[in-house]
C-alpha cells in the first residue's frame, strides 16, 4: 500500500509541475535551502550512474541516494535481457521510473522485455509518437501491464529523491524528428551535475542554451557521438570534465564521429565509451568515482 501511495503521489506531482508553476519552484527551493544538518546528510549517501553496454544503443541506470531507481532507455530489443541481468546483479527487482527519451528502436526496443518481466511504477515519455512496430509493441505492453504513462514537459522536475534535482530540458512536443524530440535531463546531486542528451542534435542544443544552465561535470554525449550533435559552442557552455559515448563496436554509422572526438580532446575532456564495457560512476555530491579510475574531485 505504501508503494502504491508513493506512485500516486509522484504521478500527481508530475502532472502538476512545470517550469513556471509556483509549486515546482517551492519544491526545488525546499531542496536547495535545506538546513545545514539536512544538507550534510545528503552526502552520506551516494548516487550511482551506470552507462550500460548495450551495443549500438543507449541505456543508463541511476540509483539515487534514497534507493529509488530510474532507467533511461533500454537499448535495442536484444539488449533488454542484458539490462535485466544487470539489474538482477545489482539487486534490483523493481524500477521506480523508466524514462523513454524518444521512440527510436535502439532506445526503446530493450524496454519491451524489461516492461514484460520487471515491475515498473511509472514510465515517463517524450510525448513523441511513431509508426514503427517497435513503438506500438512497446506501448501495447505498457497498457497491458497497466503502468502509469506520462509525457513530460520542458522545465519539469522529476521528484524521485528530495536531495537530487532531475530537470527535463527538452521533450517531444511539436517536434518533427525523433532525435529532436529526445528527452534531455540535467541531474544534480550536491556539486555533481550530469547532463544526459539522448539523441538530441545541434538544433536542440541551441534551443536548450537559450533557456537553461547546461554546465555539467559529466556529459552523456548526444546521439552516440554523431556529427549531428555536440557542437563547439555547446561544449564550451557545458564545460564537462567527463564525456560518455554510448555506441557499439564496429557499428555501421561511424559512431562516434572523429570530429566530435577531436573537439572533446581539444577541450581536455576525459572520454569513456560503452563499446567494451559498462561505465560505472558514483558520486557523494563532492567527488565522482569512475570504475577503477578512483576518486575524481569536482572542479568547481
Each PLM stretch: what is its role?
Residues 2-8, 16-300:
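Non-globular, low-confidence helical/coil segments that flank catalytic cores
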Amino acid at each position: 500500500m505504501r508503494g502504491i501511495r508513493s506512485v500516486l503521489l509522484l504521478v500527481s506531482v508530475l502532472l502538476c509541475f512545470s517550469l513556471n508553476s509556483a509549486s515546482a519552484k517551492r519544491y526545488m527551493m525546499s531542496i536547495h535551502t535545506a538546513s545545514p544538518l539536512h544538507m550534510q546528510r545528503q552526502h552520506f549517501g551516494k548516487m550511482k550512474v551506470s552507462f550500460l553496454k548495450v551495443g549500438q544503443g543507449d541505456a543508463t541506470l541511476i540509483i539515487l541516494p534514497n534507493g529509488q531507481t530510474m532507467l533511461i532507455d533500454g537499448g535495442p530489443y536484444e539488449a533488454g535481457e542484458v539490462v535485466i541481468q544487470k539489474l538482477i546483479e545489482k539487486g534490483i527487482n523493481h524500477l521506480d521510473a523508466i524514462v523513454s527519451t524518444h521512440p527510436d528502436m535502439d532506445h526503446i526496443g530493450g524496454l519491451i522485455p524489461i516492461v514484460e518481466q520487471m515491475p515498473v511504477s511509472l514510465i515517463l515519455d517524450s510525448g513523441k509518437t511513431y509508426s514503427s512496430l517497435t513503438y506500438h509493441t512497446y506501448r501495447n505492453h505498457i497498457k497491458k501491464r497497466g503502468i502509469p504513462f506520462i509525457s513530460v514537459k520542458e522545465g519539469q522536475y522529476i521528484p524521485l529523491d528530495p536531495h537530487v534535482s532531475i530537470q527535463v530540458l527538452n521533450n517531444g512536443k511539436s517536434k518533427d524528428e525523433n532525435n529532436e524530440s529526445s528527452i534531455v535531463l540535467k541531474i544534480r546531486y550536491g556539486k555533481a551535475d550530469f547532463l544526459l542528451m539522448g539523441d538530441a542534435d545541434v538544433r536542440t542544443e541551441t534551443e536548450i542554451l537559450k533557456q537553461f544552465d547546461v554546465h555539467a561535470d559529466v556529459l552523456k554525449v548526444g546521439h552516440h557521438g554523431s556529427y549531428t550533435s555536440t557542437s563547439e559552442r555547446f561544449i564550451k557552455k557545458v564545460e564537462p570534465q567527463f564525456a560518455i559515448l554510448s555506441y557499439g563496436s564496429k557499428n555501421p554509422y561511424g559512431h562516434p564521429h572523429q570530429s566530435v572526438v577531436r573537439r572533446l580532446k581539444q577541450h581536455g575532456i576525459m572520454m569513456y565509451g560503452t563499446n567494451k564495457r559498462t561505465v560505472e560512476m558514483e558520486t557523494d555530491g563532492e567527488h565522482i568515482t569512475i570504475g577503477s579510475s578512483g576518486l575524481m574531485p569536482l572542479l568547481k
